[in-house]
């Protein structure tokens, strides 16, 4: 009864929670297994951000429930789906023995002890707790990179987003605690630190009454073993001149930013309640572009309620004009409990998918042209693996799992975690080929 497996779905922020649960379980003598068939207990850390994520979470619960016919004794759901559907989830999915919300995952050991006694456990309704400080992590990423969560929750009130209800209001972690965790990760061999939160750029606003991300980055860059610091989930309205200067002048911060913009049309931004304007977005992009070698990733949403052909055309032209190196396009997901749920008219699924496809076609060409422009240049690559006779890794331009890869041809023996400087010799739509 000591084998536990965790399946972590959704975003990297969820992965960090899973890593903390793993550490708590290991501390109490549980064996962590990667093969679900060998597990006595399976924990599914769920996502419920959009419809597809909910479906995936439910499919995993049903699929893992099948294992109860064999070795598996207990099945537990944690994370956003649990927080959102709590009682309904445990009622509709009888294979679940426990449902734990986002603020209660630190009680995982006690919950397992409870279900062993034959009880069904339901814990939710505390998303505002920030009670996981000081809990170690068992990394589920390769040893050379790790995510560093600097805040929990979100106080932005975007009309399409359920996250504030599932994760509570914005809560920055104390800077000294973040630094301590980063030092510990670096001691364990982490070379790339990826900064995450629902909104990284709001860091400090609640705790220190001012935006403190530039200072935090400055402190993190003093950690000797770290080579790359990467920033994800930046919001345009909080990208200050001070932050831009820090990114520009700090050698350890990679010249890459993930800045979800969602739309370009003033009227759509207003309906989305994004708290920013087209002018502000244009200003921020222009300032970020002043940083040599800057690579920008963004995400856009199509099919938001009431999105007209004109508003969509505006977005198309914006993408063509700004030529972002990395773009993700989502179709709007109508979520109960959000303001946009009641907005009219809702856009037909067929139209949403067509718009998504159109944008991705435009972006594919932009990405290809950008990659082609890299042929003949030198790039530093973090090696991640070897397959079919070639190494592969990422350059500063690529965040793990969401961006492309650099394939590296080399006669030398290379290892995951090595940094090598390659000459780019070929390019595809999303990947590069280099020689070393």
From Swiss-Prot:
It is found in: Cytoplasm. One of its GO terms (biological process) is tRNA modification. Pfam families: Radical_SAM, TRAM_2, UPF0004. [4Fe-4S] cluster 2 binds at residues 154, 158, 161. Residues 140-369 form the Radical SAM core domain. It catalyses: L-aspartate(89)-[ribosomal protein uS12]-hydrogen + (sulfur carrier)-SH + AH2 + 2 S-adenosyl-L-methionine = 3-methylsulfanyl-L-aspartate(89)-[ribosomal protein uS12]-hydrogen + (sulfur carrier)-H + 5'-deoxyadenosine + L-methionine + A + S-adenosyl-L-homocysteine + 2 H(+). Its EC number is 2.8.4.4. One of its GO terms (molecular function) is aspartic acid methylthiotransferase activity. InterPro entries: Elp3/MiaA/NifB-like_rSAM (IPR006638), Methylthiotransferase (IPR005839), Methylthiotransferase_CS (IPR020612), Methylthiotransferase_N (IPR013848), Methylthiotransferase_N_sf (IPR038135), NA-bd_OB-fold (IPR012340), Ribosomal_uS12_MeSTrfase_RimO (IPR005840), rSAM (IPR007197). GO terms for cellular component: cytosol. Residues 2-117 form the MTTase N-terminal domain. Keywords: 4Fe-4S, Cytoplasm, Iron, Iron-sulfur, Metal-binding, S-adenosyl-L-methionine, Transferase. PROSITE patterns: MTTASE_N, MTTASE_RADICAL, RADICAL_SAM, TRAM. The keyword tRNA-binding does not apply. [4Fe-4S] cluster 1 binds at residues 11, 47, 80. Residues 372-436 form the TRAM domain. Its main location: cytoplasm. Its cofactor is [4Fe-4S] cluster. Binds 2 [4Fe-4S] clusters. One cluster is coordinated with 3 cysteines and an exchangeable S-adenosyl-L-methionine. Catalyzes the methylthiolation of an aspartic acid residue of ribosomal protein uS12. Belongs to the methylthiotransferase family. RimO subfamily. This is Ribosomal protein uS12 methylthiotransferase RimO. It comes from Caldanaerobacter subterraneus subsp. tengcongensis (strain DSM 15242 / JCM 11007 / NBRC 100824 / MB4). The lineage of its organism: Bacteria, Bacillati, Bacillota, Clostridia, Thermoanaerobacterales. The gene is rimO.
């Amino acid at each position: 009864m000591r084998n536990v497996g965790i399946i972590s779905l959704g975003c990297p922020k969820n992965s960090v929670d899973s890593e903390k649960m793993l550490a708590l379980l290991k501390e109490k003598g549980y064996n962590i297994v990667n093969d679900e068939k060998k597990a006595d207990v399976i924990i599914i850390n769920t996502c419920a951000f959009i419809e597809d994520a909910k479906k995936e979470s439910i499919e995993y619960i049903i699929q893992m429930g099948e294992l109860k016919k064999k070795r598996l004794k207990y099945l537990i759901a944690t994370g956003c789906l649990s927080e959102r559907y709590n009682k309904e989830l445990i009622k509709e999915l009888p294979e679940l023995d426990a449902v734990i919300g986002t603020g209660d995952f630190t009680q995982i050991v006690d919950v397992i002890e409870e279900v062993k006694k034959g009880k069904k456990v339901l814990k939710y309704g505390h998303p505002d707790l920030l009670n996981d400080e000081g809990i170690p992590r068992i990394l589920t990423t390769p040893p050379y990179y790790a995510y560093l969560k600097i805040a929990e929750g979100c106080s932005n009130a975007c009309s399409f987003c359920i996250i504030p209800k599932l994760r509570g209001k914005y809560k920055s972690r104390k800077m000294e605690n973040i630094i301590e965790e980063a030092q510990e990760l670096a001691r364990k061999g982490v070379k790339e630190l990826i900064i995450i939160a629902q909104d990284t750029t709001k860091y400090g606003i609640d705790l220190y009454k001012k935006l403190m991300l530039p200072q935090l980055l400055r402190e993190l860059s003093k950690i000797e073993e770290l080579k790359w610091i990467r920033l994800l989930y930046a919001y345009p309205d909080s990208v200050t001149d001070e932050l831009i200067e820090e990114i520009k002048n700090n050698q350890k911060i990679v010249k890459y930013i993930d800045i979800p913009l969602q739309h370009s049309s003033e009227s759509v931004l207003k309906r989305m309640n994004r708290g920013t304007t087209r002018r502000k977005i244009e200003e921020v992009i222009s300032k970020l572009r002043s940083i040599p070698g800057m690579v920008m990733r963004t995400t856009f949403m199509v099919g938001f309620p009431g999105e007209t052909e004109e508003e969509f055309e505006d977005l198309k032209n914006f993408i063509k004009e700004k030529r972002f190196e990395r773009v993700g396009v989502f179709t709007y997901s109508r979520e109960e409990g959000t303001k946009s749920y009641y907005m009219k008219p809702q856009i037909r699924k067929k139209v949403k998918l067509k718009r998504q496809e159109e944008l991705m076609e435009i972006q594919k060409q932009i990405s290809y042209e950008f990659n082609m422009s890299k042929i003949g240049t030198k790039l530093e690559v973090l090696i991640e693996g070897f397959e079919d006779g070639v190494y592969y890794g990422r350059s500063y331009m690529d965040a793990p799992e969401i961006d492309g890869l650099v394939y590296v041809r080399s006669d030398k023996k290379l290892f995951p975690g090595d940094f090598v400087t390659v000459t780019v010799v070929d390019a595809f739509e999303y990947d590069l080929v280099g020689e070393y």
